[in-house]
Curated annotation (Swiss-Prot):
InterPro entries reported in the protein's UniProt record: Ribosomal_bL27, Ribosomal_bL27_CS
Protein name stated in the entry: Large ribosomal subunit protein bL27
Example GO biological process: translation
PROSITE patterns per UniProt: RIBOSOMAL_L27
Source species taxonomy: Bacteria, Pseudomonadati, Spirochaetota, Spirochaetia, Leptospirales
UniProt cross-references to HAMAP family, sorted A to Z: Ribosomal_bL27
Gene Ontology terms for molecular function: structural constituent of ribosome
Gene for this chain: rpmA
Pfam family, one: Ribosomal_L27
GO CC annotation, single: ribosome
Length: 85
């Protein structure tokens, strides 16, 4: 008879690496041209003035300025960057 039980197998123990999504520069903060503002899956936020969109729906600043989050509709928000005057 064995003194130790055989090591059984398990179906658990795996997890995916986090994708680090979310807002990187918040409203009222300063952004430099090229700065990533939001990393997202799909277009939760739409690009507004002076904001570009990457092929993975990442929003980034096209000019230096202040980031603003604006409501287009009740549910839909767009992000714009306005240059400092």
């Amino acid at each position: 008879m064995a003194t130790k039980k055989g090591g059984g197998s398990t179906k658990n123990g795996r997890d995916s690496v986090s994708k680090r999504l979310g807002v990187k520069v918040y409203g009222g903060q300063q952004a430099i041209a090229g700065n990533i503002i939001v990393r997202q899956r799909g277009t939760e936020y739409k690009p507004g003035k002076n904001v570009g969109i990457g092929r993975d729906h990442t929003l980034y600043a096209l000019v230096d300025g202040i980031v603003t989050f604006e409501h287009v509709t009740k549910e839909r928000q767009q992000i714009s960057v306005y240059p400092k005057v």
